[in-house]
A protein has these predicted regions:
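Short terminal alpha-helical segments
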Residues: 1-30, 82-89
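Alpha-helix boundary/N-cap detector
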Residues: 1-8, 28, 32-35, 53-56, ...
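Amphipathic alpha-helical interaction modules
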Residues: 16-63
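Amphipathic alpha-helical binding modules
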Residues: 56-91
Length: 91
């Protein structure tokens, strides 16, 4: 997978999170999630290894991003984005 595709997926996630309220069922605020994603984007842009474990946790089913996306009406978009991240993690 091209790293640009992962970066685009993470940036799209940030765009949605910036418009979202933190989920009451999540143990992490939208702002905290954004900070973690920005770190991973920076690593990817600088040809450094991304933290696969962090991405797995953030994008896991019933994880913090999915909970936030459902609570804010972009759950279907999350599934599409998560598929890109899963492709990266699996590859």
């Amino acid at each position: 997978m091209e790293i640009e595709k992962l970066i685009a997926a993470l940036e799209e996630t940030i765009t949605h999170l910036q418009k979202s309220q933190s989920s009451g069922s999540s143990n992490m605020s939208a702002e905290e999630i954004i900070r973690k994603l920005e770190v991973e984007i920076s690593k990817a842009r600088n040809a450094k290894p991304t933290d696969v474990y962090t991405l797995e946790l953030l994008f896991a089913p019933t994880g913090v991003i999915q909970e936030t996306s459902i609570d804010n009406g972009w759950g279907t978009r999350f599934l599409r984005i998560a598929a890109v991240v899963d492709e990266f993690i699996g590859g």
